[in-house]
Swiss-Prot record:
This is Contactin-associated protein-like 2. It is a single-pass type I membrane protein. Residues 554-591, 963-1002 form the EGF-like domain. Coiled coil: none annotated. PROSITE patterns: EGF_3, FA58C_1, FA58C_2, FA58C_3, FIBRINOGEN_C_2, LAM_G_DOMAIN. The modification Phosphoserine is found at S1303, S1306. It comes from Homo sapiens (Human). The gene is CNTNAP2. GO terms for cellular component: axolemma; axon; cell surface; dendrite; early endosome; GABA-ergic synapse; glutamatergic synapse; Golgi apparatus. Residues 1-27 form the signal peptide.
């Protein structure tokens, strides 16, 4: 438990350093001594042995490097894969390198070999590298020496070399040298009963830092290695569970509170192989490093305490019996330990000198006792034949096996006298027995037992059969044994085949049901007799093929786990597979995020404002988070919510303790930091409502209130101010209520006051905590509001550099992507070649380049030889358009994709090097005299980290920061006539000459018209304000200054109405020319043209449908001289022709009217007839040539002075959804949420600290909000009935009422004028109420 102050931290640090040194000093040579001594050259002949020799002059004793004794080296009698050369060093050595040479001056040499090692000359272990049983490249001639440094040193007394391949024109010939140094360590043997305690001098041990190191080996899968506990609930336990290492730790829990300190971490696998494994536990407070066999796992303990409090002792080898359930339910350790060090104390040395008293009954010895089991290792082409006793009426076989494969043949044997056969196999992870009978009507008896037996653990199988009876038992569980009493006659045969069966070798026509077994077996018994595998190895009796006796070389390919981001690893014998479901990632190793890195990226995929999952660091460790992307402006806002309600009352303050308000965000602080770091600008609104509650205590006092931001730093400024300035917004603007103070609240008034504003220094954001004081006085009150974090822009997405000449390059630090690497970027160029990037190692390298105008190449070498993947494009890539390149390489495969072309994939070899080892700097744009890249690269990300090309270009001579020409690639995103404008970071769409609004000029701009309302657009702006809302009609300007005559025009608009007849659009002139679009009493559409030259206007009647049906309709009218094209909704365009006598010019256009025509002079009778009472409904997208009258009325544009409005114009989209870029299909769109409630769609990923809050609102808030919604709905329903009663005679169109409706011209105007919170436009697609 943590209770004491931090006294003694210096001593603890010294202990940390000393113990770290000591724990290594007992197990390794001094760091000043290079471990590279030749270990073979001085050995006598008797230290060498081999499988065979041609003769005495070829004996293994002559296999010393650079020696010519005898025949010049060792050569076996037969050159096959069963030969080996063995060296005994006399005692254990630390081995760091190996070298080989062929037999002197001959054609005999080995080209590939394996190295096995052992402490006893039994139970051999093959040398592993990069997760595989390693095959060393050998010699290419007889006298050259080939030396290999081991990737990690090994400790062994015996080394065995097994030739895999040799010179085809000669035979096996070998001379060797092994390099290393002496090794010594104290060893203790634990028999499973004895426990070794180390008792503390003061009966207690309170530590902030610990270092515990030891080596162990065992053939048991369960057992406690060390244990310590304290009376306050602290404990530490290191134990084996199912042959995996488990560290359990508790630094303290609070029984009465929410603090739960138990932490458990599992690592390793197959640790019951009776080979040495090293463990180091390093603890500093709650930070833990657990290292097993050079693989380190870092984690932090649960809870809030830092000290480990142990009482009396720490024990090794088990838990002393204390009467507690935990002490009797766990098995003690059975095996060997060496070099046990606890915080600098050499436990093994104390035990050897009898300074420690073992507890429990048992034997403690100081030499390692080896097991008597002999394992045998099978591969896909192996089998083991052992003899049996012929013609016995009892068939009995038992063995233990371990494997990763769910299927495989375990045992096969024929009965004597052709009675049938028995096959025992593994089928879908169960053991099955199939007895084929040839003498009875029943042809086969099948029984099975067990489940999940391909988990890599040892499992025991016992099968017994006799007349009319058989029983199958798994793992000694007699209660679950499977029996059968089917008719059966048994006479045992003379051969038993384990692991495989070859028909052609045994004159059998029987086909086994399963493929050969891949795994290990041991303790094989046939006819109740233990099989002597050493005799089988000498083929007396029995035989075998491709098996390794006295070795179990099973590999756990899921340790270490190459499946990233929580992917689940499953394996077979020679491969593994990652399941990435519900992780948010994809790919062979769950490396690639399925989400975009930012809202900016979603915008350019055509998405609209909504909730999205983003992954700011891509393939990095942070994971995805859910944010709201607001895309209604040119720059996208990313909004991260939290759980604090607006105007939350501040309670709980007293003079001794401040009130602390903690904000819980819908993402972790690391995730939010990734957003703020990449954003161009961030802000967060804060407000403090106060009544006799001071805020910052300005001008000179200590602040009563502060907020905590990123990195847990306190800040003493408020919204609207900046860092280092203890002021509020009013203090900056000098308009505080009392000018003596810098905050309104600091004046300490008894009336409610407010200090509010935006915090915009993004390096301090987000606000994670607000600490409030000064609310304890009589009458003091305060309310706190903190808005969501809002960030704008994405510096990473447009981060770019221009490469002005082929010899230019940018350099960065070495790329770290040993086992997993992903690279993505955009490029554009006019040249057909160039190196994008390159990083070199001693032999390894990685390179991406444009090889030709249509080819992109990804090449690399991890030690297995160069690999190149090429994507070929059907169209040139040097077209000055942006193209995206994505390359990935991991231990499973490598891939390359360009744009949306098919991805090219190359599988990695099942054996070989897997680590990409690079040493040089990373060069972007080419280096080393190669053909450099000429063009532009942007958004270069490597393993989730964006390289800052812009900043590096600024400090590199000859470079241009940023890129131009974005419109060449993205200009098509600007729709409806919008113009693409280049920006330093990207581009924008200019919608000023369109009837649309929004980022891509795809948002409708429309308005709702009530009866009698109208809009006039004068083609020449008058001198006075044309937007005066009076009903005055200005006199026409001088005709000489009117709009020029038109030989062609285009009119586009959308409308919806339920009233007919009405005028939709009317264009007048200073002559008699006009153009009108109207709805007739029947609801049909009519276009009337009068260009002069005809007695009557030319009419186009569209009679095939009722247009006054309340649905939105789009109209496009285009005239070129006498030809008119009309397109209505989705119908095909229809052409019409004006009479031959008609003029071709629209003379002197004057004004454009919407809703109603208010014009002086003579008006066409048909127009006059339909002009009353006027249009009621919605108009949008109205455009006449380059003029958008509605947009000019609703937006402050240069044309706004031309507009005059009668009535209150209320914006609406007329029920039409805004146009968007062509969306991706839902099948390929991982962020597609349309099938869910976008505000509540939850991804099953927990991004760190607790469960993510839906849209930043917790469950309690949702319940409160639901109750409030029900109350409001009830009130609104009551109001609707009251309004229906009060206005039952008026019959006009209404939307929601608001205060001040009596003085407003409409209910909608009342909402706009009186409700400051009203920000949404009226959506006519919603249900309309006719009152």
């Amino acid at each position: 438990m943590q209770a004491a102050p931090r006294a003694g931290c210096g001593a603890a640090l010294l202990l940390w350093i000393v113990s770290s040194c000591l724990c290594r000093a007992w197990t390794a040579p001094s760091t000043s001594q290079k471990c590279d001594e030749p270990l073979v050259s001085g050995l006598p002949h008797v230290a060498f042995s081999s499988s065979s020799s041609i003769s005495g002059s070829y004996s293994p004793g002559y296999a010393k490097i650079n020696k010519r004794g005898g025949a010049g080296g060792w050569s076996p009698s037969d050159s096959d894969h069963y030969q080996w050369l063995q060296v005994d060093f006399g005692n254990r050595k630390q081995i760091s390198a190996i070298a080989t040479q062929g037999r002197y001056s001959s054609s005999d040499w080995v080209t590939q070999y394996r190295m096995l090692y052992s402490d006893t000359g039994r139970n051999w272990k093959p040398y592993h590298q990069d997760g595989n049983i390693w095959a060393f490249p050998g010699n290419i001639n007889s006298d050259g020496v080939v030396r290999h440094e081991l990737q990690h040193p090994i400790i062994a007394r015996y080394v065995r070399i097994v030739p895999l391949d040799w010179n085809g024109e000669g035979r096996i010939g070998l001379r060797i040298e092994v390099y290393g140094c002496s090794y010594w360590a104290d060893v203790i043997n634990f028999d499973g009963h004895v426990v070794l305690p180390y008792r503390f001098r003061n009966k207690k041990m309170k530590t902030l830092k610990d270092v515990i190191a030891l080596n162990f080996k065992t053939s048991e899968s369960e057992g406690v290695i060390l244990h310590g506990e304290g009376q306050q609930g602290d404990y530490i336990t290191l134990e084996l569970k199912k042959a995996k290492l488990v560290l359990s730790l508790n630094l303290g829990s609070n029984q009465l509170g929410p603090i739960y300190g138990h932490t458990s971490v599992m690592t390793g696998s197959l640790l019951d192989d009776h080979h040495w494994h090293s463990v180091v536990i390093e603890r500093q407070g709650r930070s833990i490093n657990l290292t097993l066999d050079r693989s380190m796992q870092h984690f932090r303990t649960n809870g809030e305490f830092d000290y480990l409090d142990l009482d009396y002792e720490i024990t090794f080898g088990g838990i002393p019996f204390s009467g507690k359930p935990s002490s009797s339910s766990r098995k003690n350790f059975k095996g060997c330990m060496e070099s046990i060090n606890y915080n600098g104390v050499n436990i093994t040395d104390l035990a050897r000198r009898k300074k420690l008293e073992p507890s429990n009954v048992g034997n403690l010895s100081f030499s390692c006792v080896e097991p008597y089991t002999v394992p045998v290792f099978f591969n896909a082409t192996s089998y083991l034949e052992v003899p049996g006793r012929l013609n016995q009426d009892l068939f009995s076989v038992s063995f233990q096996f371990r494997t990763w494969n769910p299927n495989g043949l375990l045992v096969f044997s024929h009965f004597a006298d052709n009675l049938g056969n028995v096959e025992i196999d593994l089928t879908e992870s169960k053991v099955g027995v199939h007895i084929n009978i040839t003498q009875t009507k029943m042809s086969q008896i099948d029984i099975s037992s067990g489940s999940g037996l391909n988990d890599g653990q040892w499992h025991e199988v016992r099968f017994l059969a006799k007349e009319n009876f058989a029983i199958l038992t798994i793992d000694g569980d007699e209660a679950s044994a499977v029996r059968t009493n089917s008719p059966l006659q048994v006479k045992t045969g003379e051969k038993y085949f384990f692991g495989g069966f070859l028909n052609q070798m045994n004159n059998s026509s029987h086909s086994v049901l399963q493929p050969s077994f891949q795994g290990c077996m041991q303790l094989i018994q046939v006819d109740d007799q233990l099989v002597n595998l050493y005799e089988v190895a000498q083929r007396k009796p029995g035989s075998f093929a491709n098996v390794s006796i006295d070795m179990c070389a099973i590999i756990d390919r899921c340790v270490p786990n190459h499946c990233e981001h929580g992917g689940k690893c499953s394996q077979t014998w020679d491969s593994f597979k990652c399941t990435c479901d519900e992780t948010g990632y994809s790919g062979a190793t769950c490396h690639n995020s399925i989400y975009e890195p930012s809202c900016e990226a979603y915008k350019h995929l055509g998405q609209t404002s909504n909730y999205y999952w983003i992954d700011p660091d891509g393939s990095g460790p942070l994971g995805p988070l859910k944010v709201y992307c607001n895309m209604t402006e040119d720059k996208v806002w990313t909004i991260v919510s939290h759980d604090l309600q607006m105007q939350t009352p501040v309670v709980g303050y007293n003079p001794e303790k401040y009130s602390v308000t903690q904000l819980v965000y819908s993402a972790s602080m690391d995730q939010i930091s990734a957003i703020t770091d990449s954003a161009e600008y961030c802000e967060q609104y804060v407000s403090y409502f106060c009544k006799m509650s001071r805020l910052l205590n300005t001008p000179d006092g200590s602040p009563y209130t502060w907020w905590v931001g990123k990195a847990n730093e306190k800040h003493y400024y408020w919204g609207g101010s900046g860092p280092g300035i203890q002021k509020c917004a009013c203090g900056i603007e000098r308009n505080c209520t009392d000018p003596k103070y810098y905050c309104n609240c600091d004046a300490d008034y008894k009336q409610w006051r407010k200090d509010a504003g935006f915090l915009s220094y993004k390096d301090h954001l987000p606000v994670s905590q607000v600490v409030v004081g000064d609310t304890d006085r009589q009458g003091s009150e305060a309310k706190l509001s903190v808005g969501p974090l809002r960030c704008q822009g994405d510096r990473n997405y447009w981060n770019a550099a221009s490469f002005p000449n082929p010899s230019s390059y940018l350099h960065f630090s070495t790329f770290q992507g040993e086992t997993s690497a992903d690279i993505s970027f955009y490029f554009k160029t006019l040249t057909p070649w160039g190196v994008f990037l390159e990083n070199m190692g001693k032999e390894d390298f990685i390179k991406l380049e444009l090889k030709s105008a249509t080819e992109v190449s990804f090449s690399f070498d991890v030690g297995n030889g160069p690999v190149e993947i090429v994507v070929r494009s059907p169209t040139p890539l040097n077209d000055d358009q942006w193209h995206r390149v994505t390359a990935e390489r991991n231990v499973k495969q490598a891939s390359l994709q360009v744009d949306r072309l098919p991805q090219q994939i190359r599988k990695a070899p099942t054996e070989g090097h897997t680590r990409l080892e690079l040493y040089s700097q990373l060069f972007v744009g080419g280096a080393g005299g190669q053909q450099g890249f000429l063009g532009c690269i942007r958004s270069l990300r490597m393993n989730g980290v964006t390289l800052d090309l812009e900043e590096r270009a600024k400090v590199t001579s000859g470079f241009i920061s940023g890129c131009s020409g974005h419109c060449t690639s993205y200009g098509t995103n600007c729709e409806n006539g919008g113009k693409c404008l280049e920006r330093y970071h990207g581009y924008s769409c200019d919608c000023s000459n369109t009837a649309y609004d929004g980022t891509f000029c795809n948002k409708d701009v429309g308005a709702f018209f009530e009866e009698g309302m109208w809009l006039r657009y004068n083609f020449q702006a008058p001198a006075t304000n044309a937007r005066d809302s009076s009903s005055r009609v200005d006199n026409a300007p001088d005709q000489q200054n009117s709009h020029p005559d038109l030989a062609q025009e285009e009119i586009r608009f959308s409308f919806s109405t339920t009233k007919a007849p009405c005028i939709l659009l009317y264009i007048s002139s200073f002559t008699t020319d006009f153009l009108a679009v109207l709805v007739k009493p029947t609801g049909s559409l009519q276009i009337r043209y009068n260009l002069g030259g005809t007695r009557e206007p030319y009419n186009i009647d569209v009679d095939h449908r009722n247009m006054a049906n309340g649905q939105p309709h789009s109209v496009n009218i285009t005239r070129h001289e006498k030809t008119i094209f009309l397109k209505l909704d989705h119908y095909p365009s229809v052409s019409y022709h004006l009479p031959s006598s008609s003029d071709t010019l629209f003379n002197s256009p004057k004004s454009l009217f919407l809703g109603k025509v208010i014009e002086t002079g003579k008006i066409d009778q048909e127009i006059h007839k339909y002009n009353t009472p006027g249009f009621t409904g919605c108009l949008s997208r109205v455009q006449f040539n380059q003029i958008a009258p509605l947009k000019a009325a609703l937006r402050q544009t240069n044309a706004s002075a031309h507009v005059h409005i009668q009535g209150e114009l209320v914006e609406s989209n007329c029920g039409a959804s805004p146009l968007t870029l062509s969306p991706m299909s839902s099948a390929t769109d991982p962020w597609h949420l349309d099938h869910l409630d976008s505000a509540s769609a939850d991804f099953p990923y927990n991004p760190g600290q607790g469960q993510a809050i839906r849209n930043g609102v917790n469950r309690n808030s949702a319940i409160i909000g639901g109750v409030i919604a029900v109350v409001i709905f009830t009130i609104l329903c009551t109001l609707v009935f009251l309004i229906r009663y009060m206005f039952r005679h008026k019959g006009t169109y209404h939307t929601n009422e608001a205060k001040g409706a009596e003085s407003a011209e409409s209910a909608d105007a009342a909402i706009m004028n009186n409700d400051p919170n009203f920000t949404e436009t009226i959506d006519e697609s919603k249900k309309e109420w006719l009152i």
